[in-house]
Amino acid sequence: MPSGNLWKVLGLCLLSVGAWGQEDIERPDEDTQKTFKVSISGDKVELTCPEDPESEKMTWKRNDMQIYESYDNYMLLESFSEVENSGYYTCTVGEKTSHRLYLKARVCENCVEVDLMAVVTIIVVDICITLGLLMVVYYYSKSRKAKAMPVTRGAGAGGRPRGQNRERPPPVPNPDYEPIRKGQRDLYSGLNQRGR
């Protein structure tokens, strides 16, 4: 059997064993899956106990010290502080088994929760706007450049523009670059003669 087919058969065997093993997982009862519900809004944290208090009082403890007692299954912690309010929270209804939760949360008054799709949308829109502005600037500068420099080359003009520019007088010579007179015996006039 070629080695390619061997790997395919081995892969199918592993997949079937994995699927067969998943069927044997026991599903826990709904009673054992009860969990706390934690809601954070601004600097407030609301804990909801998985037990219903029915007609008895519910006792809330933090680090095994009683902090709250009510007939509701939730507790609201206002002005939550990560340092002061973090710890193990337990809720107990009467003499029933208590549920434990370790809570450590960072909160702030003016925080806004942003989901992943909002962040991706903001980034994509920002990139599109930036590219759009880049293209507008490119095409605008390209069209202005074409209007500013007309390319007209005539056969007899030698590549120079025609019209009024042709009648323009030559530029005024700069006094710093005056030509050396033949009557002067300066350093530069001597160098010039040796070079010939």
UniProtKB/Swiss-Prot annotation:
Membrane topology classification: Single-pass type I membrane protein
Signal peptide location: 1-21
UniProt-listed GO biological process terms: adaptive immune response; cell surface receptor signaling pathway; positive thymic T cell selection
Compartment(s) where it occurs, according to its Swiss-Prot or TrEMBL record: Cell membrane
Pfam families, per database record: Ig_5 (PF16681), ITAM (PF02189)
Protein name: T-cell surface glycoprotein CD3 epsilon chain
Gene encoding the protein: CD3E
Species the sequence originates in: Sus scrofa
Phosphotyrosine PTM sites in chain numbering: 177, 188
Region Disordered, annotated ranges: 150-196
Residue ranges of the region described as Proline-rich sequence: 168-175
Superkingdom of origin: Eukaryota
GO CC terms, sorted: alpha-beta T cell receptor complex; external side of plasma membrane
PROSITE patterns recorded: IG_LIKE, ITAM_1
Function as written in the Swiss-Prot or TrEMBL entry: Part of the TCR-CD3 complex present on T-lymphocyte cell surface that plays an essential role in adaptive immune response. When antigen presenting cells (APCs) activate T-cell receptor (TCR), TCR-mediated signals are transmitted across the cell membrane by the CD3 chains CD3D, CD3E, CD3G and CD3Z. All CD3 chains contain immunoreceptor tyrosine-based activation motifs (ITAMs) in their cytoplasmic domain. Upon TCR engagement, these motifs become phosphorylated by Src family protein tyrosine kinases LCK and FYN, resulting in the activation of downstream signaling pathways.
